[in-house]
Amino acid sequence: MPLNAVIFTLLLRCSICLGKFPFYTIPDKLGPWSPIDIHHLSCPNNLVVEDEGCTTLTPFSYMELKVGYITSIKVSGFTCTGVVTEAETYTNFVGYVTTTFRRRHFRPSVNSCRDAYNWKIAGDPRYEESLHNPYPDSHWLRTVKTTKESLLIISPSVADMDAYDKKLYSKIVSNGRCSEISPGSPFCPTNHEYTIWMPESSNPGISCDIFTRSMGKKATKDGQLCGFVDERGLYKSLKGACRLRLCGISGLRLMDGSWVSLPQVNNSEWCSPDQLVNIHDFHSDEIEHLVADELVKKREDCLDALETILFTKSISFRRLSHLRKLVPGFGKAYTIINRTLMEAEAHYKSVREWKEIIPSKGCLKAGGRCYPHHNGIFFNGIILGPGGEILIPEMQSALLQQHIELLESSVVPLKHPLADPSTVFKNDDEAESFVDVHLPDTNQKISGIDLGLPEWKRYFLIGVSAVALLALSIIIAVCCKRFRKRKKSKPGPVELTRKVSVISKGNGPVPSWESYKEGTTGDVRNTTPSTRE
């Protein structure tokens, strides 16, 4: 937590609520003085605000800002754009195919975008396949349209979350700001009607991981919670606290600028817009532990000084300074008047600047006036120097001053105005460069016969084609008829054999080979006897 209520309490002024941190305490109510014995001296308990009377301590758990919490809460997300890619093919009469690609957009659904994103981060091959344009189909003399509805995912797309109202701020969302992401509204509209922004996690509440649960002791009075001792042992008062939500968690902003979520706290007063929460980072956490150690050490120093006083039976102005209450509230003040130890009831207030208590030289402002001194002695070790200047033993602590400067530079801004109107795209072409393609199922539509000609030319071409086809049919029919006629008038090979003629001995025609053979044999037979004769 930032600077604890160890240094604050119920009666801090409004300036303290707005980020002013004290480094010294001085009585705003003092007196009357009464003599006391040296044995009545006591060291104040700076870890408890005594005037609240919250003495009953009970262990309990509470939520506070996690150490290391930074002002800018980054929420990783992605953009989802609906795109319809259309491939139109036309095949003309001679088979020439013309393909035209067109793109238009549509507003995607939340569930489809979530599924597409899961595909992408899981490395599903279907997502890689969907990156291509639709494969165009074609039919002769027809126009074919092939379309794909694509969900284009861009990731990461980081937005800043405002811890106060869980609104998201990004340059791409509408007006640079988006209301809280919830189950009823799981997306943010963007500057483009067809694009939505969604968180990477389906449960965006985990993005606001800035809280941690700590153990402490709640301080009650008559059963009423009025403060608590935090995990580091420092008391924090609930006086002056106001209700404030961080990341949707209801809690209390304490007067020191810290934030806690306590159970069973009824406070109807809400914080004003200028009451912000201090950051709890590693540096402030380290200093906080040093502050707690310093307070413990100062109490030990006070006890050592008190032991020395009681042992030596003597007291000095410097030792009286150890008895000053470091926490605003009721306590004791001590001084020495005419060598007599004096005590007075006092109510301490916080001091931010030295000029608050030393407005001019020689004036120590306490109780609303320049407090009178007694022989140059004021109280709590404060004296008047030889030159008339006020001398305070405790100069401002360098450690506390370092803590103050750290806290003043570590206030969470209420808004993160990252919206830049100049980044709004004027047309669709400018938006194409920030999308990746995811393509689901394909739809095809096949038109009727389309020659790509005007109406009269199309019918004229059909008529000419019909006449040409008829003429071609007639020519083919005539050719076929002539071919058949020629084939029918040509003799066969058997008939040609039978018509072969031979010449006989008497030079007469021989009708056949058999007749020729018979004729030749007869001649041979007739000539044989004569030869013998």
Curated annotation (Swiss-Prot):
Signal sequence, renumbered to the chain: 1-19
Lipidation (S-palmitoyl cysteine): 480
Keyword list, A-Z: Glycoprotein, Lipoprotein, Membrane, Palmitate, Signal, Transmembrane, Transmembrane helix, Viral envelope protein, Virion
GO cellular component labels: membrane; viral envelope; virion membrane
Xref: InterPro entries: PH_Rhabdo_glycop, Rhabdo_glycop_CD, Rhabdo_glycop_FD
The keyword Phosphoprotein is assigned to this record: no
Regions of this protein lying in the Virion surface compartment: 20-459
Predominant place of localization: virion
Top-level taxonomic group: Viruses
Residue ranges, annotated region (Disordered): 492-533
Changes after translation: Glycosylated and palmitoylated by host. Glycosylation is crucial for glycoprotein export at the cell surface.
UniProt cross-references to Pfam families, sorted A to Z: PH_Rhabdo_glycop (PF24834), Rhabdo_glycop_CD (PF24833), Rhabdo_glycop_FD (PF00974)
Topological domain spans for side Intravirion: 481-533
Membrane topology: Single-pass type I membrane protein
Extent of Polar residues compositional bias: 523-533
Gene3D superfamilies documented for this protein: 2.30.29.130
Cell compartments where the protein resides: Virion membrane
Transmembrane annotation, as ranges: 460-480
Miscellaneous remark of the record: Arg-352 is highly involved in rabies virus pathogenicity. Its mutation dramatically attenuates the virus.
Sequence similarity: Belongs to the lyssavirus glycoprotein family.
Role according to the record: Attaches the virus to host cellular receptor, inducing endocytosis of the virion. In the endosome, the acidic pH induces conformational changes in the glycoprotein trimer, which trigger fusion between virus and cell membrane.
Complex and partners: Homotrimer. Interacts with matrix protein.
Protein name (database record): Glycoprotein
